[in-house]
Amino acid sequence: MAIKFHDGVVAPQEKSEERAKEYAQTVNKIENAVFRNNLNALFSQDEILATRLFSLGEQKNYEVFIGKDPIDINIIDKKTLSYLYEKPASDIQNMLEGLGAECKRYPVMFFYGLGNGVFYKALLYNQTHQHIIVVEPDLEILYITLNLVDLSKELLSERLIIFYSELTTYSQIYQLMIGQVYSVYAKTYNFHVHTPFYDKFADDYNRINQYFVRAISQVVASHGNSVDDLLQGVRNNTENLPQLIKGYVYQDLIKKRKGLMDTAVIVATGPSLDKQLDTLKKFAPYVTVISLDASLPILAKHGIKPDYVTSIERVIETSSFFKKRNGNLDKDAYFIVASLTHPQSVKNILPRRLVLTLRPQAECSMGLNKHGYLGIGLSTANQAYQLAYVLDHKNIVLIGQDLAFAPDGKSHATGHAFAQADENLYTTAYGGIGEVRTTYVWDKFKNQYESDIESTNKKGIKNYNCTEGGAMIKGTIEKPFVQVMEELTRGKELKNLPHISFPNEKTIKKELLQAYKFIQTKIKFEEEVKQKLEEVFLEVAPDIDKMIEIRDKGELSEKHFKKLLSITKKIDKAKEFAGRQKYRRYIEYILSISVYYQELELAKISVEPSDTTIQKVNKLAEWVEMHKYWLFSLAGGLDAEIKTTKKASKNLIKEVKKLGLI
């Protein structure tokens, strides 16, 4: 599958397609049609695993017993004589009647252990199961099963997704869980062990389970939990549009400087930064220096010139980092700042070189692609890392990136303006020995770092954590900063980076008009959806309240089924209206914040049993009750965004009028 990284460019697939052709030609020589078909299908999911299975030699650890019944397949460990199943056919039948029936409404299910594959083949006859994720710890069992049971159709459609646990990483699980169906059904997550045979892999099971739990937590956190924060971002982004369009263009800068430097040093503000500053000053002329916003005052104090300063925060407090002018120290630096930054930050940075950038979220829908996209994750540290990647550095070095408290309790380097609130979470220490105290937010930053680093490691980029303290960041090479700088700058010339010009007047006018039209259409469509939701809410809310009152009295019965079904149909029509393609691009972001947590609860309700009429009645009562809050929340969110956008777009309207564009 093509993977989009942070510059919004799809990774080239030519080499992958060539490998697929070569692989298919080789695999097609396999006599066993079942194994051949399975490997070809698996290759589209996991090239490395498919190749490992193809090249696997003699099987030594297991024996296979096949009875008269085609599903009577058992696998026995030769050393321990433990059986995968006691009685394969009846065990699988019991699993289908038990877990299969219990979870028959689950769109997504997770299992540890592939077994003989028959259970999953049967389970996927239920079309409700959109995806079944299976993690198998033993390569030989994978090999045996894919030789015996044809799962090619299920693998090719990705209704069955197989991971080999030895190759499985947090980044892979995170990339899986950011998918829409996985994130919505996060609260239904349960990691089922296939059979007791797999109990001997308990440590591995726990490791993979932690990956899923971390990934789910990261995905939920990325949705945010505050409409107020979202509205502040909308307000700031809309107010900043004229400056974004008239200022330096992000893609122009990337094209001009891509591949010019080999090494980037990202400067964070952890307590370990103090000891690295002298080394950084010495080697700064030979590397790209990317300063986080909070690091700028510290670098200025020590006379270190940054090449880029990144910032992603929307609050006014961040603007204080840019208040002081640093003369020659930052006159040539480009301030790469998310467009949702506070307008005061824009004022404080100017007239220095400001590049406002769009994040790969709701801003994509405006079509101002030259100004994006940068800033996946919750931190400007993640933004800086993604910038270093997009600029095509071969080496990315982190310093001051403690993501943990120092032994003396300090959370930041000397000279940093803000302290970190107390929390008692612990993570593996730098060097892998012991633990250090961290925070929930820092842990989420670290998760994003590790996901990005795993992706770039595969592309041949070397990632160094030269913080020499704080938390371990998996995937990085831990080395002393001075040693890494000496190695990477040996024989390098002083850097001499070219600058870019402002966009021409024609482009500015075109994009201002484009932004204006988008904002007007957005307001119009949001008002249409809001009106529809309010109408339906006012119509169904009294009926829902009545049904809930009856339920709470214990008087809900089968006779209420038709009424609840009628309410549900009205709600469904409202959701279908809001989900129309023409509205979706304009309301998707406010939708994701306003009702995401209701959607998580609705997903839980949707998988509850409803085999009898009374079960259906109780389930529908829960369903309509949650949708009352859903309708109210989204209508309220839209109303707030409409008002915010109208007020914030005054700058843009003034600009287009001044230029005679409307």
Tell where the protein language model's regions lie, with residue ranges.
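Glycine-rich phosphate/pyrophosphate-binding loops
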Residues: 136, 295-296, 303-313, 388-415
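Generic beta-strand/beta-sheet core signal
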Residues: 268, 292, 312, 336-338, ...
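Phosphate-binding loop/pocket of nucleotide- and phosphate-handling active sites
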Residues: 410-452
